[in-house]
Amino acid sequence: MTHRSFRFSIERPVEYRFTDTRGGPRLQGRTVNISSTGVLFRTDEKIGVGRKLEVTVRMAQLAPNAPEIDLRLLGMAVRSGDGWVAVQARKYQILRPEGIAA
């Protein structure tokens, strides 16, 4: 029996870049859902399965007067279709917007 991670339907802005090429642009998208094993997001780009990505999700404030945080993950595209990609996370990191680890 396989374990499936619970998915949270969260729509947030995404910025991503390919880590298997040098000097590529940072691209934009929007999350569809997030789980403990990865993220599914919409994008205008065609992303092939196997591509390595760094994905930064702009999270909302967790509490009044709290700083906003970003969720950054390193992973690989495991499924993709017309206008979407599923990225399996290899590593997660929570950052303050300035890029400093929380």
Descriptions of predicted regions:
Residues 1-102:
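Structured alpha-helical
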